[in-house]
Structures are given as C-alpha cells and as structure tokens.
C-alpha cells in the first residue's frame, strides 16, 4: 500500500507544527521518499535525535508503506546559512 507525499507532509506538520516540509517521491512508487524538514524543534539536537522526531511523527508508516526515507533536518538558522 502506497503513501503520498501529502500524507507524509501532513503527519510531520501535525507533530511539528512550525515545520516547513518538502517531500518528494523519489521513485514514483509511493514507498521511497526524500524529505527536507526545517524546524526550530531541532535546535540543540543532533542528527539522530532530529530524525527520531520525524520518524515518531510518521509512526506506523515507517513500518509499512514507507520503505526508504532520506532526510535533511536543519534548523531554520542552519537552512538560512546554506
């Protein structure tokens, strides 16, 4: 069963309301995605903890329809410095 980029975006925004979220279906099959999640909730957290926050937001979708998810998780300040 596939999941849409819009559904992924909505789940992340529900858990991290301040987040700017961009999601791409990298294969067109609804199971491989790349996402950039920019949130102040990431301030003071390392990459693993940032990813855990996103995985928690996606819940059971990480064990089901999402097979692969490439994440970029900058804070707003880190994103502005790019």
Placement of each model-derived feature along the sequence:
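N-terminal first-folded block
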Residues: 1-30
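Short loop/turn motifs enriched for small/polar and acidic residues
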Residues: 26, 38, 72-76
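Short, active-site-adjacent cap segments at secondary-structure transitions
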Residues: 29-31, 78-79
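Short connector loops at helix/strand junctions that flank enzyme active sites
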Residues: 30-32, 37, 64-66
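A short interface-forming secondary-structure element
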Residues: 34-49
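C-terminal structural segments of small proteins and small subunits
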Residues: 51-82
């Amino acid at each position: 069963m596939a999941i849409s980029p819009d559904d992924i975006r909505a789940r992340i925004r529900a858990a991290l309301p301040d987040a700017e979220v961009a999601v791409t279906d990298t294969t067109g099959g609804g199971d491989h995605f790349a996402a950039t999640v920019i949130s102040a909730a990431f301030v003071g957290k390392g990459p693993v903890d940032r990813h855990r926050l996103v995985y928690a937001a996606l819940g059971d979708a990480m064990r089901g329809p999402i097979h692969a998810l490439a994440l970029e998780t900058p804070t707003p300040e880190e994103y502005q410095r790019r």
